[in-house]
Amino acid sequence: MARPHRVRLRGPAEPPRRGHLPFADAPGVPDPIEVGSRVLTRGGRPWFPVSGEFHYSRYPAGEWEEELLKMKAGGVTVVAAYVIWIHHEETEGRVRFDGDRDLRRFAELCARHGLDFIPRIGPWVHAEVRGGGLPDWVLARTAAPRTDDPAYLAPVRAWYRAIAEQLRGLDRAGGGPIVAIQIENELYDQPDHLLTLKRMAQEAGLSAPLWTSTAWGGVRLPPDELLPLYGGYPETFWTEADGGWPDTCRKHFFFTHQRDDEGIGADLRPTTVRGGDPEELSDRFPWATCELGGGMAVAYHRRPRVEAADVGALGLTKIGCGSVWQGYYMFHGGTNPPGDLTPLQESHATGYPNDLPRLTYDFQAPLGEYGQYRPSYDELRLQHLLLADFGGLIAPMESVLPERLPTGQHDRETLRWAVRADDRSGFLFVNNHQPHEPLPHRPDTSFEVEFPGDGPVLSLPSAPVTIPQGAYFCWPLRLEVAGLRLDWATAQPVCTVDDGHGRTILVLAATDGIAPELALDLRTVTTVSAPSDAEVTTAGDRALVTALRPGTDALVEVDTADGRRVGVLVLDAATARGAYRGPAWGAERLILSADGGVVFDAHADEVRLHSAAGEPSFAVLPAPRRAPVVPGALVKEAEDGVFVRYTVVAGDDGRTGDDVLPVTLVRPAGEAPPVTTGVMGRASVPAEAYFDSAAAEYRVALPDDPPPGTLLRLHWTGDVGRAYVGERLVADQFYSGRVWEIGLGRLPVGELRVRVLPLAGGAPVYVPGRVGDAAIPAELLRAECATVRPWPLRPG
């Protein structure tokens, strides 16, 4: 038998520092925010924010509110958004904050739904936008943008004043949602300019307890003026087509205490920096992030595919590494506005090293360009439920690495794991997933965790297990819930919920391929009752629950020594990925939905289920006294373990399934365009003329008056696809092997034409699944539409 993987928790070498940083709310602000060396606090309590990036100016304003509710239901507590200057002032002096550019309304919607807000005000933001967000007229005025050149600072000062006017009264001193403001972006070597920008923003009237800066690339910051925020992506669009999977991405699937990622933005830095953490940053500031990859954009020359497990494993690994702020870029995709004068995407034509699609900025995000739910949304929501209940416990815990560590970033044989713990309890993190190069199964695995003091070493599980390929998880150690101490469990904490009868239920998610076991501290327990198929054995001060079949009925009931009632419910992994918790019909409830996404709308006093199923179902704990009501539909109910399951039977035909649409070939493709290159010798998007002369053209017969939420799904191959209504470009895509989705509700009335260019053999373009440098023909193979219907679930 292999020897256990072991870690010894010695406690911190020195206590965390407090009061040494100037970040704080104004006097008198309720629940003031403060920053210590290892943790953020709010109202004196550890605070573990979860921020998600959503660019309001890349999304229809009429849909903002529902998308913010989706983000909140996904566990996002803070919405971050670039304020993209060129979107607001493409023409000098014509500053627009109307429609999709209404910054104030967006911030107010965040506040309305209890979400904090972080405007990332630039002025240079990157964001794969033309000029990094700097309008052309600004760049024409100065030879030294992003410096203290007076010719640059003058328009920036006016821009900051315009932002401040929009956000007036929305700071925390005024009861508003703004918890932080980011200055600039990826500016690593000009601390004096960063300080100038901060002072200008403050003089303009902007205010927040936290002023932040991106901190990757060996950043130099003005001392104690900006909170450094870090990032990490599972893939890149900005590296070379033939460069393979970058080591700077590989590192994020290991447990490490190195915060910096020297790879982010490296294509725009004139010098090569070596990743590292200046001692004054890592010792003075907590590990906070703003750009953990929720997905990845695609460039013409490099089109990475990011899968849900890539996003989920990276996020969970960062918590194990010591993160106290999970910030995702992007959490929600969008579409570039068309621009009045020029296209607004990053491109070779503007001197940038990457050609991006003109319109789509989907980013393969957890919520897509048209609000689509992605599997990565479920993976992250499961982690965010954990943080909502236990983040305050985890945040001050130190990250401790085990005795045996991987020998380097190409070591696939050594188990990757870490523990977050204090001297009383902790969480054990394991990651056995990475993209591109799968990690092997880990047979005969067990752990020993030695807490400080004279207590016994915690050994788990009861017998060694095999950790499956692709698994990543967090297991609790000595977790106390409502008077019960759970010594350990081989299942991940999800959340707690009151069952409506005075009993607290701790919900756990089983790890695929590993039998769930619960070790209960008998000193906190008087009675234990388990399902009939489970086994309960006792030894010393511990009761061990084994042979538990996870599911909605896998409830272990406990009476605690202090007179409380506790349940431990172990869901199977697939069911747990459909777990939502929020205020519903007068109480906090746990909802399980495998048929679509759930949002909680307290203002409308309803829950909405976004589902493509003809008869969607969902399970609720605790169940309301009367079944929810769906206008125009019948709601059936049935027991489902400790839940009540409701099924919606539509009064209409309820059709939401996929419908195949007629596709007509208007013109076959010609010869693939020759390859041209731009900055850094990277392949460029073919010239506009080729879309008229070389592209295959198809006509897609769209349904008349499609219901809201209808997506067109195009199965295709080729190089570049563009969709038109009349002469207007309405959607575009670089081929990466994925189905191309277009929201029909965004399209003007008219015939849809799709043009597809073929990819030439030998083209220096990375396409996942491409065999060598083979040509890819231009074909629209199938078109279908599917409707995701919002079902309002109202109190019965």
Predicted regions and their residues:
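The substrate-binding groove and active-site-proximal loops of carbohydrate-active enzymes
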Residues: 48-61, 84-103, 138-158, 177-191, ...
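Catalytic-core region of carbohydrate-active enzymes that cleave or remodel glycosidic bonds
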Residues: 115, 197-209, 256-354, 420-423, ...
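N-terminal carbohydrate-binding accessory modules
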Residues: 1-78, 777-779, 784-793
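Aromatic- and acidic-residue-enriched segments that line the glycan-binding/catalytic groove
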Residues: 93-101, 112, 123-150, 154, ...
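Aromatic-lined substrate-binding rim segments of carbohydrate-active enzymes
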Residues: 64-131, 202-203
